[in-house]
Amino acid sequence: MPSFDVVSEANMIEVKNAIEQSNKEISTRFDFKGSDARVEQKERELTLFADDDFKLGQVKDVLIGKLAKRNVDVRFLDYGKVEKIGGDKVKQIVTVKKGVTGDLAKKIVRLVKDSKIKVQASIQGDAVRISGTKRDDLQSTIAMLRKDVTDTPLDFNNFRD
């Protein structure tokens, strides 16, 4: 029985490369000369450092640009609040989201059942497994999910015949 998994996961290698490119650009840009602006990464948590709110916005723009160039969807980023860390310096913690949340998984299952396509959906941890008898049904399910779920980036992997 053909099946595939619906997941939501960023490519962390590309995220790391985008951070390195961002730090390189920040270190060479004229408007950041003499400032302590940078991006650090610990697992799935990115920390943006800057001298003030304006420069923090500039750091964020550079990071988003580099992520977009490396084909990492910026909807994976979850921004925390801006914190002051002494003097005028500020930092912001950005979390890279992973996995299909419970609410989104239920929404996907409901969409699949309401679509009247002859496939079954089951929640398996942080993924949703879609299985059906025909490959065409699975492909039309992928097209339907891409059209209807726009708030979270979805990946379709583990396609098996």
From Swiss-Prot:
InterPro entries: DUF520, UPF0234_N, YajQ-like_sf. It comes from the Bacteria. CDD domains: YajQ_like. Keywords: Nucleotide-binding. Pfam families: DUF520. One of its GO terms (molecular function) is nucleotide binding. GO terms for cellular component: cytosol. Nucleotide-binding protein. Belongs to the YajQ family. This is Nucleotide-binding protein BceJ2315_27070. It comes from Burkholderia cenocepacia (strain ATCC BAA-245 / DSM 16553 / LMG 16656 / NCTC 13227 / J2315 / CF5610). The lineage of its organism: Bacteria, Pseudomonadati, Pseudomonadota, Betaproteobacteria, Burkholderiales.
